[in-house]
A protein has these predicted regions:
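Extracellular glycan-modifying ectodomains
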Residues: 1-262
Length: 262
């Protein structure tokens, strides 16, 4: 809808399948740890001790930090990631507005170096790869707030004029790894924790703004008796009418009648 209104967004690595949902080949991220790691490897050269997974049977090389990106060899993976670093830096340094959508607090952590893998899935796991060095846990308020603060610190050093818009995803969990809570309770915990984090983060910085997409989808529209879920998506993703309602509110808040940013 931004493009339909005459706006553009940064598109690096347009050839790369992992850039379909982002301005560079970051793939989708589901937690603030994965977000923070993007900024740290882009600007600070940080790298996990176990950079690649090798599937035991197929030999496919998997990037566990960018969802499910697969290669035929380590050399191919390393070359692609080196190119990605250039594009990632260029995208973040040139951005005028950065939108961060907070999703989950459930994470899978490498016990060796505390890096967070994006998803415990893909050929490596399916083919019997060793997941013993990774542990599941629920991240908490202070950790998530610190992740956003570190992102702000890095952006302030490399692109201080950039504004950051924070939202919370209205897409709830459809499954949980927790043994102490059902999926509805786990989802409520994730969203309420991240909503509180977003509120505190926004209050600390003049260039950080909160946009209430979560509240519009999960509270306001149900109060009006309007459905928010797309048919055939297990009451999981929001429907097109909800998306349009949210985007109209977004334009009303941030864009004037001449399509100029407010």
């Amino acid at each position: 809808m931004l493009v339909q209104r005459g706006f553009s967004y940064i598109t690096e690595e347009t050839h790369h399948p992992a850039s379909k949902h982002a301005s560079a080949a970051w793939e989708r991220t589901y937690n603030t740890f994965s977000m923070r790691q993007i900024f740290e490897y882009t600007f600070e050269g940080r790298s996990p001790s176990s950079r690649w997974w090798c599937a035991p049977k197929s030999g496919k090389i998997q990037d566990p930090y960018r969802r499910i990106i697969l290669y035929d060899s380590i050399e191919e993976a390393e070359a692609d990631f080196a190119r990605h670093l250039v594009h990632s830096r260029r995208a973040l340094e040139s951005a005028e507005v950065l939108i961060l959508t907070l999703g989950l607090t459930e994470i899978w952590e490498d016990t060796a170096d505390q890096w967070i893998i994006c998803l415990p899935a893909g050929p490596y796991v399916n083919e019997g790869g060793d997941m013993s060095r990774y542990r599941f846990r629920v991240s908490r308020y202070d950790e998530n707030l610190d992740n956003l603060e570190q992102i702000h610190r890095i952006m302030a050093a490399h692109n201080p004029g950039c504004h950051i818009i924070v939202t919370v995803s209205p897409v709830h969990l459809w499954a949980t790894f927790r043994l102490d809570a059902d999926v509805i309770s786990a989802s409520c915990n994730s969203k309420s924790t991240l909503r509180a984090v977003a509120d505190e983060f926004t209050s600390r910085h003049e260039n950080v703004h909160y946009f209430p997409a979560f509240e519009m989808a999960t509270i306001y529209r149900p109060m009006l008796g309007q459905s928010i879920f797309a048919e055939g998506r297990e009451n999981f993703h929001v429907n097109q009418e909800t998306v349009e309602h949210i985007m109209e509110a977004f334009f009303a808040r941030y864009v004037d009648e001449d399509n100029a940013a407010k």
